[in-house]
Amino acid sequence: WIASLLLLISSFLILKEGGKLYIDETDPESPLRMYLATRNIVPLSFFSVFKTYWVEEEKSQRLASLPSPAELASQCGADKPIVVLVLGESARGDHFSVNGYGRKTNPQLEQVSHIINLGIARSFAVQTRNSLVGMLTNATEENRVPTMGSFIPLFNKHGFMTCFYSRQNKLGRSGHLTDALIGSSKDIRYFSSPTDQDLLKETEPLFKTYQHGLLLLLHTTGSHYDYRGNYTETFKVFAPDEYTPESMMEHRQNVINAYDNTIVKTDDFLAKLYAQLKDHDAIVVYVSDHGQLLGEHGRFLHAIGGTGTEYPEQKNIPFFFWYSDLFAEKHGDIVAALKHASTSGKIFTHDYLYHTVIALGGIRSKAVEPQLDITGLGTLD
């Protein structure tokens, strides 16, 4: 545990300056920032570091000890599809042109068929480490403490290959809370590759090996700050995109340009992922963990104000599905239900994700709450 603690401390980007320890506020999801940082860099002690570590460790242990949905009665159909859950990062739903944004940030997705868009949804929290709890357990906005662990063991129970591929730092923003949520996956990989697109080099052979009965979680870096460093020149559609942390308000339009370029990058990533799956029995869910402030209220980034009600842009997220022809052929009832939901006018939240993902795998379970299953097909009577 000592080695883990030392890695955790270094991942929080603590800087030595003038004989004192400081926290780098440029990482908005650092638990130390969440507990200790103000708008300016402030001194902090090793005691605070240890305290935060143990708080996180206790949370991790509580998550790991939650009852598993695999322990409850469940059934699974013979046709087991590929289910891919793309955990987007810091993406705002109202900056996607498929949601009516004035800039063409989704030139490829606008041309893709078989997308079912739930519109602009609302996140469980305003930082990754908390939102993942709302996305991967049965926690809801109303009942924020989960009573059931991740759905991954349930897919394991029914013979699915389960994988978690991430470009997020293992001990960084999400901390080891992530490990507690995805630790039952059969294949867990963390990548330090330059872009999200590099994940596609890993998914292509995976889809050739497992042509059905696969649950894959892809945790991308998406639109996380620093925006300009989060995409290549290929996706520099909106310019100028130069700014510094100190000049973000002065160069707000440049910041927005850079942010929108990250959405263009995500557009390309998803289109290529869909292309890899077009001949498979597959469905892809894309949803972001939280949104982002882009100068509204004089603020930037996220993880500001606790619940996010004061700055709602932080909870503004995209939420949509893509399905293949073969999936529609074999699971037409799921497709019909999702299409119906997309025209309901309802504002969807992370509350629905847990129960709906189970149903997408053709699994019916006592763990599924019918009012939170968008398909209406995952409940076991």
Indicate residue ranges for each PLM-predicted region.
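Membrane-interfacial entry segments at the cytosolic side of transmembrane helices
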Residues: W1-L7
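Extracellular glycan-modifying ectodomains
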Residues: I9, S223, Q292
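Active-site-proximal alpha/beta segments of enzymes that process anionic O-linked groups
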Residues: F12-E246, N316, T349-L380
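A long, amphipathic alpha-helix that forms part
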Residues: P67-S74, K201, D241-V284, F321, ...
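Metal-dependent active-site segment of extracytoplasmic phospho-/sulfohydrolases and closely related
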Residues: V84, T262-A303, Y354-I358
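Histidine-centered active-site microenvironments of extracellular/periplasmic hydrolases
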Residues: G100-K104, A282, V287-H331, V368-P370
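A short beta-strand-to-alpha-helix junction
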Residues: N143-T147, Q253-V264, T307-K315, A328-V357, ...
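Flexible internal linker/loop segments at domain or repeat junctions
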Residues: E233-Q253, L301, F327-A337
